[in-house]
Design a protein with these regions (language model features):
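N-terminal Rossmann-like or analogous alpha/beta NTP/dinucleotide-binding catalytic cores
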Residues: 1-118, 122, 213-214, 218-231, ...
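Short, basic, helix/turn surface patches
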Residues: 65-73, 103, 129-142, 265
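Short secondary-structure transition/capping segments
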Residues: 82-97, 121-127, 150-158, 278-293
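Alpha-helix initiation and N-capping motif
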Residues: 55, 88, 111-114, 126, ...
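Non-catalytic terminal extensions that flank enzyme cores
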Residues: 1-15, 33, 38, 65, ...
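Short, mixed-charge aromatic SLiMs
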Residues: 46-56, 244-246, 295-303
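Alpha-helix boundary recognition
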Residues: 96-100, 202, 263, 276
Length: 314
C-alpha cells in the first residue's frame, strides 16, 4: 500500500454541488501529489435518504471530472464493504468495545428538548449536550424505556485534544466543553457519523482525511474514538468552504450550483480550472485537468478562510 491513502466520502442524498466537488478535488490532489491512492466510500448510513441512484450518479460525476479512485464504491476492492449501509455488523463490534469500557449510556432527550434548554452549540451548529441523562439510575432508565426507545451517547472527559490540521494549522478543543457527550447510535438503531467514519477510515487504511471546514469540530471527537478503539488516526486537512456570491453557504438545495446543471454549461476542464483558481492553485480560471494540477498543488496556497465565489465565475 502507498504511504498515503486519501478518500472521497460523499453522502448520496442528492447530486454533487460545487462545495462537495471542491473537497473531492483537493483530497484527490493532496493524495496524488504525494504519490498516494484514493478510496471511494459511500456514506449512506441513512439509507432511506440516500437512494443508490444518487450514489451511482456521484460516481459518474467524479469519473466525468477525471477524479478517478483506486478502490471502493461500485468498483469494490479488498477493504469493503464500501457502502456504510452494509456495515452495521462492523460498527456493532466497535460499539460493543466502547460499551465494555463503561462509556456508553442511553439518552432519552429529544432534539426539541435540547434546543429548548438553550444549551451552547458546537461550531458545526450542533447542541453541546448538557449531560441530562448521564447520571440516570438503572431504575430511572427502566422507567423511561417504557415510554421511549433511547439513543446512545459516548461519555467524554474534561480533556483538551490538540492536533495540527494540514490546512488550518494547530487546533485545540476540549471534549467536554466544546463537544459534549455525543451520539454513537440513534434510537432507531442507525449508527452515528462519528463512529462510522472512524471505523471505516481505519479498516480502509486511510491515512489522510480531507474534508470541509464545517467538520473541523468533529476531529477531536474522532481522535478520542481512535484512541478508545486502539486504532491509528489519520492526518486531517479541512479546506475552506465555498460560499455563494451573496455569502450563503452552498448546499444541495442550490440547484444552479449542482454539477448536474453545471455540466450543461461547462466542460469538466472548465469546472476544475475555475475551482483551482478559487482555491489559489492557479492565477486565472483557465481550463485544467486534475492531473495537470498535481505539480501546482500545495496546502500553503489554499486560503484559510471560507471562499466567496466571485460573481460570474460559475
Amino acid at each position: 500500500m502507498s504511504a498515503v491513502t486519501g478518500r472521497f466520502a460523499p453522502s448520496p442524498s442528492g447530486r454533487l454541488h460545487l462545495g462537495n466537488l471542491a473537497c473531492s478535488l483537493l483530497a484527490w490532489l493532496s493524495a496524488r501529489s504525494q504519490g498516494g491512492r484514493i478510496v471511494l466510500r459511500i456514506e449512506d448510513l441513512d439509507a432511506e435518504r440516500c437512494p443508490r441512484k444518487y450514489a451511482d450518479a456521484l460516481e459518474e460525476d467524479l469519473r466525468w471530472l477525471g477524479l478517478v479512485w483506486d478502490e471502493g464504491g461500485s468498483s469494490g476492492g479488498p477493504n469493503g464493504p464500501y457502502y456504510q449501509s452494509e456495515c452495521a455488523d462492523i460498527y456493532t463490534r466497535s460499539y460493543k468495545q466502547l460499551e465494555a469500557q463503561g462509556l456508553v449510556y442511553p439518552c432519552f432527550c429529544s432534539r426539541a428538548q435540547l434546543h429548548a434548554a438553550s444549551a451552547p452549540h458546537t461550531s458545526d451548529g450542533n447542541v453541546i449536550y448538557p449531560g441530562t441523562c448521564r447520571g440516570l439510575t438503572a431504575e430511572q432508565i427502566a422507567e423511561k424505556r417504557k415510554k421511549k426507545a433511547p439513543a446512545y451517547r459516548l461519555m467524554v472527559p474534561d480533556e483538551d485534544i490538540t492536533f495540527t490540521d494540514g490546512c488550518m494549522g494547530p487546533h485545540t478543543e476540549n471534549l467536554l466543553r466544546d463537544c459534549g457527550d455525543f451520539y454513537l447510535r440513534r434510537a432507531d438503531g442507525v449508527f452515528a457519523y462519528q463512529l462510522a467514519v472512524v471505523v471505516d477510515d481505519a479498516r480502509m487504511g486511510v491515512t489522510e482525511v480531507v474534508r470541509g471546514a464545517d467538520l473541523l469540530s468533529s476531529t477531536a471527537r474522532q481522535l478520542y474514538l481512535y484512541r478508545l478503539l486502539g486504532l491509528k488516526a489519520p492526518q486531517f486537512a479541512h479546506c475552506p468552504l465555498l460560499l455563494a456570491p451573496d455569502g450563503r453557504r452552498l448546499s444541495k438545495r442550490d440547484g444552479d450550483q449542482s454539477l448536474e446543471n453545471l455540466r450543461a454549461k461547462y466542460t469538466a476542464q472548465e469546472i476544475v480550472g475555475r475551482l483551482a483558481f478559487a482555491y489559489g492553485l492557479q492565477p486565472e480560471p483557465a481550463p485544467r485537468t486534475p492531473e495537470s494540477l498535481i505539480p501546482d498543488f500545495s496546502w500553503d496556497k489554499v486560503p484559510k478562510q471560507d471562499i466567496c465565489l466571485p460573481e460570474g465565475l460559475f
